[in-house]
């Protein structure tokens, strides 16, 4: 429900939105291809994707992109759920962990500590990309 409210607000100010029903999905902005995921696929994974890119995660997303015909001059994997921000450069894509807009719950506090909310954003202008953070 919250994602639909945010979508309506963003569309009211002229920002195009897309809400996916898939655990991993992708979209393009010019030559920039974004593959995005929740921190974990509850159906196929025991553990979350890591904060920073490792060999296993690099292989996982490389294979996913190949199987789903994902191409682009600039490729990014953006995932959430660890309530921290990190940017890692891989062999064929950049791997970005983004903070949680939600902040803390009892479960989050017990597992990650008392985390504050944050929003990470990317601005695309031709071949250039800038990334920023708004946080509490």
Regions from the PLM with identified roles:
Residues 131-136:
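C-terminal lobe/lid and adjacent interdomain/linker elements of RecA-like ASCE P-loop ATPase modules
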Residues 28-31:
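Short strand-coil-strand connectors
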Residues 1-18:
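Active-site neighborhood of divalent metal-dependent phosphoester bond hydrolases
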Residues 24-26:
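Short, surface-exposed beta-strand/loop micro-motifs that present aromatic residues
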Residues 12-15, 21, 33-35, 40-130:
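Conserved beta-sheet core of the metallophosphoesterase superfamily
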